[in-house]
């Protein structure tokens, strides 16, 4: 952690509004982006930002500096976001097993296969940029179980390393890699089913 970050954190913890404002200008956008990625709801993400910075003020004096300040803030954000989502439970999450492809004992894919060979290459830019595809992706992320969603957002949206994600979610790197792989597989399956059906 930089000396400047430590100074700002110490001052914010003692009630210095200017220091808190400086920390917010550095980290609020990242906190919001992560919170929105997990809660999938703008008002909830805004509440998470407020709660995170309140915790930073309340717990800042106890921060030991063993991790980078950004990692500590990401961990607080992840925990607050997951708690917010658990408290709401407005949307039902889907079991990951329901989202992944199924295979027969001989190794072939079970079920409808016409969408597997759908050709998306004709218009990849248009398909990726369309609002419908964005909404489809967001809906697919919404259906992921929360611990898969958190890892996916931290790794693929926030572009943190597997080691950083593991530290933030309090798990091993191997577990993070497994969750990330399963989350990506589930997203791929959902997108393939939808986009392949229209081909």
Summary of predicted features, one role per range:
Residues 13-14, 40-41, 51-68, 86-89:
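Sigma70-family region 2
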Residues 1-30, 37, 116-126, 139-142, ...:
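N-terminal module of bacterial RNA polymerase sigma factors
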Residues 47-54, 67-79:
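Structural recognition of an alpha-helix C-terminal capping motif at a helix-to-coil junction
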Residues 64-65, 86-89, 144, 149, ...:
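Short, Lys/Arg-enriched C-terminal cap helix and immediately downstream tail that follows
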Residues 3, 135-175:
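Helix-turn-helix DNA-binding module
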Residues 11, 93-103, 108-111, 136-139, ...:
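C-terminal edge and immediately downstream basic/flexible tail or linker adjoining helix-turn-helix-like DNA-binding
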Residues 61-65, 78-96, 102-106, 130, ...:
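Arg/Lys-rich amphipathic alpha helix in sigma70-family domain 2
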Residues 13-22, 32-51, 150, 173, ...:
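Short, charged helix-capping/linker segments at alpha-helix termini
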């Amino acid at each position: 952690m930089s000396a400047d970050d430590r100074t700002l954190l110490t001052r914010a913890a003692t009630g210095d509004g200017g220091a808190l404002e400086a920390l917010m200008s550095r980290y609020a956008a990242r906190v919001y982006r992560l919170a929105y990625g997990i809660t999938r709801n703008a008002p909830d993400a805004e509440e998470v930002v407020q709660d995170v910075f309140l915790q930073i003020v309340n717990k800042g004096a106890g921060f030991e500096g063993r991790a980078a300040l950004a990692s500590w803030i990401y961990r607080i954000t992840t925990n607050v976001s997951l708690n917010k989502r658990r408290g709401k439970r407005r949307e039902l999450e889907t079991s990951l097993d329901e989202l992944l492809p199924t295979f027969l004992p001989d190794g072939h894919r079970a079920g409808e296969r016409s969408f597997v060979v759908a050709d998306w290459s004709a218009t990849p830019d248009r398909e990726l940029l369309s609002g419908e595809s964005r909404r489809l992706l967001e809906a697919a992320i919404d259906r992921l179980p929360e611990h898969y969603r958190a890892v996916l957002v931290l790794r693929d949206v926030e572009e943190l390393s597997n080691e950083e994600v593991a530290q933030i979610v309090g798990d091993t790197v191997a577990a993070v890699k497994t969750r990330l792989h399963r989350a990506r597989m589930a997203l791929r399956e959902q997108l393939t089913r939808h986009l392949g059906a229209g081909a």
